[in-house]
């Protein structure tokens, strides 16, 4: 009987030896650094008011180790979240928000970037939800099967875990416009439980701004009367990356535009950019963005969007040169039409291996409309006037694009 109780204890309580321990927590003027004795797979940060605090939940970890304060942080407290992991609470001496973060050292180090703000901005940011960080590596044995914690499994591990069933075929959205016109599908990035990037200035969420921008683009295009338009989502819902371009292909779209807001640790980073597909990133920032956006599906608790290297190669092989050239041509048109209307980065046309652009026969771009982490860009993205300028730029570019294609036939 004793051995059965021991086995039940391990099964329902998790194996203590598999948990990662928090070794050290250090705070400086503009960042928090948390170190672990073994790799950690995921964490999430969020803000709490009355009193002002930053909370960080770490999946599969146990509290412990050294801690120090500094900068805006007056105190550090660690505790357990049952079988789900550890929580670190940072008591603030002055308001500060989380502007970004990342894992390094193979999951053994988490760096969270901080920025001081005024009390009103902190209060607004408390409504923004969680900012999530992931390494893509976690030992499955560290989290009990019954746990509600999201699990991201190392692809090299030889373990079996239960995953949510795939959703059935998603309903196709409404198409608006005259039936004889070419179809443009506009994809508002993120949505549902995935907020995307969050403004440290206003607490605005990327998922809300992209939906407003997509609706403005739709309305501008319909007013022009030259194309039909459909939105992949017209409400706050989550779509996996393949569903987004699959909707466009099933509808027979002639052009796909995915709308996003960029974010960077540097608060001075500013300007819109336009991405087209390439397996080789055009620069380091393009590679960073691809890594961030391609992980969007992981937020559902399992990486439904992950493809093997072989499948990824097949997709690229299938992508016709004509399609990639058409995408690049539209990107240049959009940049031209946005000049003087929407602030652009000097090298606004970039290339990256973005999953949402991998439809093999559909010209596609990802439009980063500005930096939500930059105060001026965020104000523009949140304003009706700013969205109108973006939408009119898209309308002009779309109309020229299809006029040229008609003339070339």
Regions found by a protein language model. Give the residues of each.
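Bacterial N-terminal signal peptides
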Residues: 2-13
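Signal-peptide-cleaved, periplasmic/extracellular N-terminal interaction regions immediately downstream
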Residues: 15-183
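Flexible glycine-/small-residue-rich
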Residues: 36-38, 58-60, 92-94, 113-116, ...
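Surface-exposed patches in mature extracellular/periplasmic domains of secreted proteins
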Residues: 43-45, 100, 227-235, 259-260, ...
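Short, solvent-exposed loop/turn elements at domain surfaces
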Residues: 43-45, 65, 193-197, 375
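Catalytic-core regions of hydrolytic enzymes
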Residues: 151-311, 320-332, 388, 392
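Active-site-adjacent mobile loop/cap segments within catalytic or ligand-binding domains
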Residues: 265, 315-409
